[in-house]
Structures are given as structure tokens and as C-alpha cells.
Curated annotation (Swiss-Prot):
GO biological process: DNA-templated transcription
Source species: Zygnema circumcarinatum
Catalytic activity, as annotated: RNA(n) + a ribonucleoside 5'-triphosphate = RNA(n+1) + diphosphate
Subcellular location per the Swiss-Prot or TrEMBL entry: Plastid, Chloroplast
Cofactor: Zn(2+)
Lineage: Eukaryota, Viridiplantae, Streptophyta, Zygnematophyceae, Zygnematophycidae
Name used for this protein in its record: DNA-directed RNA polymerase subunit beta''
SUPFAM superfamilies tied to this protein: beta and beta-prime subunits of DNA dependent RNA-polymerase
Broad class of the protein's primary localization: plastid
Cofactor annotation comment: Binds 1 Zn(2+) ion per subunit.
UniProt record similarity statement: Belongs to the RNA polymerase beta' chain family. RpoC2 subfamily.
Subunit structure: In plastids the minimal PEP RNA polymerase catalytic core is composed of four subunits: alpha, beta, beta', and beta''. When a (nuclear-encoded) sigma factor is associated with the core the holoenzyme is formed, which can initiate transcription.
Length: 1095
């Protein structure tokens, strides 16, 4: 306490955090009563000056940044560019979403920083500026929405809407922006109603699991502890420093600076000592913790440390378990309500950027980089190791150090401008991501075409089989534009045959299609001769069998007419079928095909001179009459005709299958042969050379002038072909650029006819819903993409994550790490000790300790990300209850758990030695319950004490229980039944014949007894009962004081009080109702204490 009194008060700006530190120092130095008077005077001073200032809010005080317009224009241009790239098929929808989200988030953060600068420059005494930045009312995010822009909004499912709100609340919202803002309004209402209940239920579970934890004794005499380090963010900035974490803790070991002892064991750490220790030994400060406390059902005073609101050692009888549960659960309710004020604004983190210091040329070594594709779809360089980028320009030279795994957004020797982003630095800690899926919908109505092969999968959905395709590689999916027309079932069934009678006002004519079976066309390929030269040609002979179907493409769709009779009640219709020739000839041209050789001669083989044949094919003329059908319908007078539009789906040209009624004519092919002779020589690469075609020309020696030619460049031009798919923006000529994407249908001399199409870039792992050549409408789901995105830092995400950690789900990283560490440590220790029976005991202890510290840090990080700090001791108490059980396994092998059999404990022989700490639990408690089942949960301390006694130790493995399961596995079935599953707990306890000793707070409350906390604690009641005896005997025995002073013992007043109380009880021959738990639960006489102290 003397450390706080020596502090000097500095003249500084008293914001919210400074006033908080001032109050802490006032309470520690002057006490609570004096602090209350000082704070009253401070409050009066604040109201007095705020009244004189006359701070009030008006619309004129909401000053917007003058840079907002061009910043938003620049962001819109970037968003439009990414949208165009997505339409071209260069990037897929997820990359476009990432780029848009990060662009607008960067713009919003830049406006937020400019808002602070503009307030300081334009009006430093602006009421909005003073209230928000002093912490009196509002925060920076709320002021940013007033004068900056609202930015990106999350929908109720937590997904980010890619359309940002560019307006602020002062300018007013448009209709679209107002509808998007309603998501945030509804989100606040849902959080207030539902998430508050979740936070309250979380508080109930936390209190339930630790309600029996009370400070019962002073010291458990443990030498173990934990090392607390700074908790850092993903960017590396410290959230919570080590100095703040060790304040109020007790040292587990003495600390030395050289040969000088700067702190002794069991010494509490104040603010000044914490500042010194963090500087002298920042990585090796071992402090005592409730996790390492040796007591079974409670925590000792030194392992807990300072009280939360006292600034001194915690009192005996303090119900620290209830305080811990309330301290963790209560911020959840506050943070839930905070969502209402921010309105669901996205506040994700992005990568750190390196920018160019000035204009110049950037140089770096490319052999340490490899090309890759970043999350925005851009081609970048990935650093394989640490890299140095040197920027040279304007007579200056500057070097930038880029760490490994970073992405370079520029090329070597590229000109960069000042403040241009040249690299993205990967965060030191990976950001929290989640896998989500995004459905991509069709912008066009048409036909789906895959450019890559896909794997067919089956998925049961709503009782039907949904066939989807899984894309293993990167590719494109095209939608060819077209129109879709559908007819109802009544129109399809309104076709009548000859001699039928019909009624009035119904459709009497319709068109139908005939389906016929087809025969395959057999191709017979005959290899006539092989020419080893530039090309290899084959002869093909096709024989078309009789009855082969010819597929005719109907280019012009027919119209459907509906005839409605109005004058005659009944009418007889006569239908005649008149054959006609629809397409008289079938012309099939077989061109010269270029095929690859399946076998080659060996290298350096001379082929003999032979006669080679080169064939050229003429056109094949086939005379094949086809038979079609035509319906004739006589129409009576007074008939009205209505057009129904087109029939069927015309996404692509319809195919009509027609049957040949007459055999085809034979095919006549004229064959032409050309012959030549040549020698050829094959090298090992398979290229052919004409030996006789080489000539050597010898020229006279002449003098030539060396002239340089500059301005040379290569010109590339795409040669369009029919059926080719071309993206928007492609140059088909040197100056002609396509304005739309499509498929080339026909090519003329001065124009190209395209079929309008829309490309979609497919990433690996994308699911394709329609089959190839399927027809879809506009707005149908085309593909589903799986990707990772940053979690929004909001309590909707934060509170379930904290609950997930506290409930220790099976997929939790801490649970998986505990199992892996246990297996690894068991195998390592077994190799050293060569004893599996003892190695798992050490591995269980170490792996459990590592998981406990990791879980404490993870829970602390969740709350720190919301701006709330929880004292580590509260989380440690909850984690201690979660990890206090172990699971018994069979066959002495903790790595192999079986499901059957019994574990019987051999009883120790009579008269065998028992350890001293075993006396705390009656031996009959173990002997009477010597049978256990595999996978049964037993307390870790009980399992350790059992293994101290028996010859063959029982094998067990560590487990991490959630707070719900830990509440249902306690020593009190009364507490379990009052929490959950009352009937199950009571029936199971009755079968097991369990006994409840009613030691916890909840059990005593249920039976109306005094709770064992505070004045109801046995230690405190003993002090009150024997207080008068203590006061009388204290004045008589001054020998005790002299003895203590002569030895210079550093005993606390509480320890002296307890020792002397034990002496008073012994001298009056009165026995207390309970032990005082001093020196292994024994009451020592005064002479014994003196002998111990002398030794």
C-alpha cells in the first residue's frame, strides 16, 4: 500500500481512462469515504463548467469531411471495375465480393480518420467532438455514422451486404439505403430480446458450475503456478499487457535481479512492483493461480490474491465462485444491448498494407517470389522468404522490408506513385474465419454450357434427388441467352383424332411432335498410308446404314394458333396426313483430318525409300428423301383464332427426328492420289527434315554498318471462329473490341453475329446445379461457391463463440489440442521413464495445464475484442471446474479406451504406509467404493490419491467438460437436480445410493440453512466464537510477540491470529467444531509452533 502513496500526480487531460486510474489510486491511498467526497467535488466541478460552456447538439455541429465526395467516387470506380471483371469472367463472384467489401471498409475507415482530423482543424471545441472523444457520450463509430458514412451492413444471418450505405444520418438516407438500414434496426430488436436471454442463461450456468467455490484457508503450500503473458491482437498490437494481468496476484517463486532478491515468494504484486517486474523479467513471472491450487473443493487465499474491488488480499469466506460466474456472464448482457447502437455495421479487419514513400521505380529480387492469385483475383507475387523492396526516384532511395508469405502487388522495375499500395503483409496471427456458402444466380435466361468436366454427386433434398456437379478445377460456365416458353397441360392434351366430337369454346387444334427411335451411324476408319512429313493424313470411309435418322434444326420457330368454336355446339373434325419432303438432300462433307501418330520409329532410324500416297477427298453427295407430316384442319365460318405464341423451350434450336421411309442411295467417293519420293531422317525429338532441301550459300566478305532499330513490337490478333466463346472486351481486330460476351454464330465480311452469353468463373470446389445444355430461367441458382470470410466483430458472433469455448464442444480447438497433447506427451514420457503406468499421470497433468491456460486466453480474447476486460482469476475458476475431472480407461492403457469391463482396485495390505495428505479423506471411502466402470468421470485429485495407495495404478485420461456437463457431474446430486434433468438425476442417484453432504451454497439455500460463505464459513464463525478468548489471552502472552520479533519473521497478521487462536484453544481445553486448516489441518500447541519456527 505504501507504493501507491509515493506516486506523483501529473497535470494531464483527464479522460475516461485517466479518471478511472485516479479513482483506483484514491481508494488505495485515502480509503472509500474520502474518495467518495473527492468524487462528489469532481462531479460538481464538471457540471459547473459544462453549464458555463453550454454544450448542446445541433445540426450545424455535424461537420462532414470535405474529402468525402472524391473518396466515395474513387471507391465507386474500383467497385465498378471489379463488377466488370466479374462480368467478363476474369474473377468469380466471391472475389468480387471480397474486393468490394474491403474497398468500402477501407474507405469507411479512411473517412473515420479524416473525421477526427477535420474536427481538430475546423473546430476543436465542437460539442460532438468533445462528447464522443472524451468518452462522456457516444463513441467514434456512432459519430462516424452521423457525419461520415454508415458503410457496410450485415444482414440477419451475419452475411455482409455488398451494397454500402454511402450517406450519413445528417444527409439523410435514400429509399434503398433505408431498407438496408432496417436490417440493423431489426437486428437490434432481436439482440435485445433473444440474445439477452442467452446471456442470462449463460450467467446461470456459470454460477451453477462454480457456486461452491469459497475461500476457506490461507495457504495450500503449493509451489506451482502459471506464467501470464500479454494477449495480442491479430495485428500484433497488445490488447492486455502482462503488467495489467499480474496486478493483484501472488508470486509463486522469488524473483532475483542478478544476486539481489527483488520479490519474495507469496508476496502480492501491486502496480509499482508489476511495472518493475514487467521490465526486469517480462517472460518468466510465475504467479499462483486457482488452477494450480491444491485444495479440492475450494481455493486458498494466496492462490486467489487480491479481491476485485478491495485492492487487498481477499477475505476468508468470500464466495469467489458466484462472483466469477456473474463477472463473466454480466458483460454478455451489456454487449448484447450494444449492438442496437451500432446497427449491425461491419467492422472486420483487413490486411496491413505497405505503401510507396514517394514516386519512383521499385526493384526487388524475383527469384524469391512465385506468381499466385490473391483473394481479389489479381495476379500477384508471393514472397517465399523475407524480401527487400527498394524504391528509387527523385534523387532519393528508400528500402522496405517485406516479411515472408506477403503478397506483392507490383512487378519488378515498375513505376509506383506515392502512397500506392505495393504489398499486403500477412497478419502475425491468423484472423478468425468461417466457412460460408454463397449461391450465384443467373442474370440471363438461356442454356447452360460447361467448359470443364464435372463430377456427378447425389444429394437428398426435400425427398427428391438433386443432381449437382462438383468442379474439381478452375474453369468457366456459360449461359447462352434464349427465350423460354411453356405450355400448360391442358393445351398438350387438347389434340383430337379423326371422327371425334368436340364441344364449343375449347381448343381444337394444337401441334405435337413425334418421337422415333434412331439408329447409330457407323464410322469405319481405314488407314490407307502414312506420310512422315509435316502432316499425317488418313483416309476415312463412312457407310451410312439404312434407316439412319437425320436431325433437322428448325431455325425459325413456328407459331401456334388456337381455334375456338362459337356457332356450332358439336363439330366433326376430319384430320388428314399429307406427306411432304421437308429436306430433300443430306450433304455430308468429310474433310482431311489431322491425327496424331500412336507409334514412332526409334531415334536416329533411317527409313527406307517408299512410295507415299496423299489423298484428297471430295464432297459426299447423298440423295436421301425424307418424309414429314402435315396436319390439315377444315375451319367452319365464324371461327376466331388466337395466337398462343411459341411452343416448347427454344433456348437452343429444336431438333426434329424424322424417319427415313426409303433406303438411302449408295455413297460415291472420288479418290485422287498424288505420289512423290523423298528421304526422311528422324531425330529423337520427332521432327522431320528434308535432307535434300538444305543449301549452303557462301558470300563474299563485306563491310556492313551496324544500325539499331527501335520501336519494334509484336502485334497479336484473335482470329474468330464459328462456335467460339468470346468474353466482353476481347479485341477481334486491332481496333475492334467486343461490347458483350457471347458465342460466334456466323461470320460475315464486315460483321460478326454473336449469341448473347454470360460467363461465370468457377473456382475449385464449386458446385454446379444445372446439367450441361440444361435450360434455366433468370434468377435460378447456377452455382454454389464455398469460401472463407472474416467473422464480423459483433456480439452476435462474440457471445456464441464465448459460449462455444465454455461449453467445450467436440469440434473446439482447445478440446482437440488437449487430446493431441496428451497422446504426444504420454509417448514422450513413456520413452524416458519406460513405464506407461506412470507416464500418463505426468502427461495428464501437463496437457491439462496447457489446455487450461490456452482456454483462459481464448475466452479473455473474445471479451477483449468487444472492449470488455474480465479479471483472469474469474475465468481461471470456471476453467478449473471444467478440467477437474478425468476419464478412467481400461487395461492400463489410456490411449486405448474400451467400452466394457470393470476396473477393480486392489485393496492395500493391512498396516501399509499411507501418505500424510491421504488422511484428509477417510480410507473407507475408497475401500467401500472400489469398483469403477470404464469412461467413468472421477475427480483428478481423487484419482491421484487412489494411485498413491494401490500397487497397480488406475489409468485415466484428461477430459474437458463444458459448464453444463460439469454442473451435472458434481459431488452433490441436490445441486445437479436443481439445475437440469431433475428426474434423471434423482433416479440415477437413488440407484447408486449416493450421499449428499450439503456443502455447497445452493444445497444449503434449498434446505434453508446458513450458506457456508461469509459469516457462515466455519473459519469466520470460529473467529467470532473465540474472539473474546483471543482478546484476553493476547495481552497476557507477550512472549509470542517478542519471539516473532526476535526472529524477524515476515508473517501476516492473519497467520499470527490463527496460530495464536490455536494456542488459546489448547490452553482453555476447548475443542473447535472444525479444523482451522493450519499446517495440514492440525491444531498445534504454542510449544510446537515455537519449535517449528526455531527449526
Amino acid at each position: 500500500m505504501a507504493e501507491l502513496k509515493n506516486r506523483i500526480f501529473y497535470n494531464q487531460v483527464m479522460d475516461k481512462s485517466a479518471i478511472k486510474q485516479l479513482i483506483i489510486r484514491l481508494v488505495a491511498c485515502l480509503g472509500r469515504v474520502c474518495t467518495a467526497h473527492i468524487l462528489d467535488q469532481l462531479k460538481t466541478l464538471g457540471f459547473q463548467y459544462s453549464t458555463q460552456t453550454g454544450i448542446s447538439l445541433g445540426i450545424d455541429d455535424l461537420l462532414a469531411s470535405p474529402l468525402k465526395n472524391w473518396i466515395l467516387q474513387d471507391a465507386e470506380n474500383e467497385a465498378n471495375v471489379s463488377q466488370e471483371y466479374c462480368r467478363h469472367g476474369y474473377i468469380h463472384a466471391v472475389e468480387r465480393l471480397r474486393q468490394i467489401v474491403e474497398t468500402w471498409h477501407t474507405t469507411s475507415e479512411f473517412l473515420k480518420r479524416e473525421m477526427t482530423v477535420s474536427f481538430n482543424i475546423l473546430d476543436g471545441f465542437n460539442p460532438v467532438h468533445m462528447m464522443s472523444f472524451s468518452g462522456a457520450r457516444g463513441n467514434v463509430s456512432q459519430v462516424h455514422q452521423l457525419v461520415g458514412m454508415r458503410g457496410l451492413i450485415s444482414d440477419p444471418q451475419g452475411n455482409i451486404i455488398d451494397l454500402p450505405i454511402q450517406s450519413n444520418l445528417r444527409e439523410g438516407l435514400s429509399l434503398t439505403e433505408y431498407i438496408i438500414s432496417c436490417y440493423g434496426a431489426r437486428k437490434g430488436v432481436v439482440d435485445t430480446a433473444i440474445r439477452t436471454a442467452d446471456a442470462g442463461y449463460l450467467t446461470r450456468r456459470l454460477v451453477e458450475v462454480a457456486q461452491h467455490v469459497v475461500i476457506r484457508n490461507v495457504d495450500c503450500n503449493t509451489y506451482e503456478g502459471i506464467i501470464l503473458r500479454s494477449i495480442r491482437t491479430r495485428q500484433g498490437n497488445a490488447y492486455l499487457t502482462q503488467e495489467n494481468r499480474i496486478i493483484g496476484r501472488v508470486l509463486a517463486r522469488p524473483l532475483y535481479f542478478g544476486k539481489r532478491c527483488i520479490a519474495v515468494r507469496n508476496q502480492d504484486i501491486g502496480p509499482d512492483l508489476a511495472a518493475k517486474l514487467s521490465i526486469i523479467s517480462p517472460q518468466a513471472i510465475l504467479v499462483r493461480s486457482p488452477i494450480t491450487c491444491k485444495t479440492t473443493d475450494w481455493v486458498c487465499q494466496l492462490c486467489y490474491g487480491w479481491g476485485v474491488n478491495q485492492g487487498k488480499m481477499v477475505s476468508l469466506g468470500e464466495a469467489i465462485g458466484v462472483v466469477a460466474g456473474q463477472s463473466i456472464g454480466e458483460p454478455g448482457t451489456q454487449l448484447t444491448l450494444r449492438t442496437f447502437h451500432t446497427g449491425g455495421v461491419f467492422t472486420g479487419d483487413i490486411a496491413n498494407h505497405l505503401r510507396a514513400p514517394f514516386n519512383g521505380i521499385a526493384h526487388f529480387e524475383t527469384h524469391n517470389c512465385k506468381p499466385t492469385r490473391n483473394r481479389h483475383g489479381r495476379l500477384v507475387w508471393k514472397c517465399l522468404q523475407d524480401l527487400t523492396i527498394t524504391v528509387i526516384g527523385q534523387g532519393k532511395k528508400h528500402s522496405l522490408n517485406v516479411p515472408s508469405q506477403s503478397l506483392l502487388l507490383i512487378n519488378n522495375n515498375q513505376y509506383v506513385e506515392s502512397k500506392q499500395v505495393i504489398a499486403e503483409v500477412r497478419a502475425s496471427i491468423a484472423p478468425i474465419k468461417e466457412k460460408v456458402q454463397r449461391n450465384i444466380y443467373s442474370y440471363l435466361q438461356g442454356e447452360v454450357v460447361h467448359t470443364r468436366s464435372a463430377l456427378r454427386l447425389s444429394n437428398a433434398f426435400s425427398g427428391t434427388i438433386l443432381l449437382i456437379h462438383h468442379n474439381p478445377n478452375t474453369g468457366h460456365l456459360w449461359i447462352w441467352s434464349g427465350k423460354l416458353y411453356q405450355l400448360s397441360g391442358q393445351q398438350a392434351s387438347s389434340i383430337y383424332t379423326s371422327e371425334d366430337f368436340i364441344q364449343t369454346n375449347i381448343t381444337v387444334a394444337n401441334k405435337r411432335y413425334l418421337k422415333f427411335d434412331t439408329h447409330k451411324i457407323s464410322n469405319k476408319k481405314v488407314l490407307k498410308s502414312v506420310l512422315i512429313g509435316k502432316f499425317t493424313r488418313f483416309k476415312q470411309v463412312k457407310s451410312i446404314q439404312t434407316g439412319t435418322v437425320r436431325s433437322v434444326l428448325i431455325q425459325k420457330p413456328d407459331t401456334l394458333r388456337m381455334v375456338v368454336l362459337s356457332s356450332v355446339d358439336q363439330l366433326e373434325i376430319t384430320m388428314h396426313k399429307t406427306p411432304y419432303i421437308m429436306e430433300p438432300l443430306l450433304t455430308q462433307k468429310i474433310s482431311n483430318n489431322i491425327l496424331n501418330l500412336t507409334s514412332y520409329p526409334k531415334s536416329s532410324t533411317l527409313i527406307s525409300k517408299q512410295k507415299n500416297t496423299v489423298s484428297s477427298f471430295a464432297s459426299i453427295h447423298i440423295k436421301r428423301p425424307t418424309i414429314g407430316f402435315q396436319f390439315q384442319l377444315p375451319i367452319v365460318p365464324k371461327i376466331r383464332c388466337y395466337s398462343l405464341g411459341l411452343l416448347g423451350k427454344l433456348q437452343r434450336p429444336l431438333q426434329y427426328n424424322l424417319v427415313l421411309s426409303s433406303p438411302t442411295q449408295p455413297i460415291f467417293i472420288d479418290r485422287y492420289y498424288n505420289t512423290f519420293t523423298n528421304w526422311c531422317y528422324l531425330n529423337e525429338h520427332g521432327n522431320s527434315y528434308n535432307l535434300y532441301g538444305l543449301q549452303m550459300i557462301v558470300l563474299d566478305k563485306k563491310l556492313y554498318n551496324n544500325n539499331s532499330i527501335s520501336g519494334l513490337f509484336n502485334t497479336y490478333r484473335n482470329i474468330p471462329k464459328i462456335g467460339q466463346l468470346i468474353c466482353k472486351g476481347t479485341f477481334v481486330q486491332q481496333t475492334t473490341q467486343l461490347s458483350e460476351s457471347g458465342k460466334i454464330v456466323s461470320i460475315f465480311k464486315h460483321k460478326i453475329v454473336l449469341r448473347l452469353s454470360q460467363p461465370y468463373l468457377l473456382a475449385p470446389g464449386t458446385f454446379i446445379h444445372p446439367d450441361c445444355y440444361d435450360v434455366i430461367n433468370r434468377g435460378d441458382i447456377v452455382i454454389t461457391m464455398m469460401y472463407e470470410q472474416l467473422r464480423t466483430t459483433d456480439i452476435i458472433q462474440g457471445l456464441p463463440k464465448a459460449e462455444q469455448l465454455l461449453e467445450a464442444r467436440s469440434f473446439n480447438e482447445v478440446v482437440l489440442k488437449l487430446e493431441n497433447d496428451f497422446v504426444m506427451l504420454t509417448e514422450r514420457i513413456a520413452r524416458q521413464l519406460r513405464s506407461l503406468s506412470r507416464s500418463y499421470m505426468l502427461s495428464t497433468k501437463e496437457s491439462t495445464k496447457h489446455s487450461q491456460i490456452d482456454l483462459v486466453n481464448r475466452i479473455q480474447t473474445v471479451y477483449l475484442s468487444q472492449g470488455v476486460r474480465i479479471v483472469d482469476k474469474h475465468i481461471e475458476i470456471i476453467v478449473r471446474q471444467m478440467s477437474s475431472k478425468v476419464m478412467l480407461v481400461e487395461n492400463g492403457d489410456p490411449l486405448a479406451v474400451s467400452s466394457g469391463g470393470l476396473i477393480c482396485l486392489p485393496l492395500p495390505p493391512i498396516g501399509s504406509f499411507l501418505p500424510e495428505n491421504w488422511i484428509e479423506i477417510p480410507l473407507s471411502y475408497v475401500i467401500d467404493n472400489h469398483t469403477f466402470l470404464p469412461r467413468e468421470l472421477v475427480e483428478l485429485t481423487r484419482a491421484q490419491k487412489i494411485n498413491y495407495v494401490i500397487q497397480n495404478p488406475v489409468a485415466y485420461k484428461p477430459v474437458l467438460l463444458g459448464i453444463t456437463k460439469a454442473s451435472l457431474n458434481t459431488n452433490s446430486f441436490i445441486s445437479e437436480a436443481s439445475f437440469q434433468q431433475t428426474a434423471r438425476v434423482l433416479s440415477k442417484s437413488a440407484i447408486k445410493n449416493r450421499v449428499d453432504w450439503i456443502r455447497g451454497l445452493q444445497e444449503n439455500v434449498l434446505f434453508g440453512r446458513m450458506i457456508p460463505a461469509g459469516t457462515g464459513c466455519r473459519e469466520i464463525s470460529s473467529q467470532l466464537q473465540y474472539g473474546n478468548i483471543f482478546q484476553k489471552k493476547w495481552a497476557q502472552h507477550t512472549k509470542w510477540k517478542l519471539f516473532v520479533n526476535s526472529f524477524g519473521l515476515n508473517l501476516s497478521c492473519l497467520q499470527i491470529y490463527l496460530h495464536f487462536q490455536a494456542y488459546c484453544l489448547e490452553s482453555t481445553n476447548e475443542q473447535p467444531q472444525s479444523n482451522l486448516h493450519v499446517h495440514n489441518s492440525r491444531i498445534f500447541p504454542f510449544t510446537t509452533i515455537c519449535s517449528i519456527l526455531k527449526s
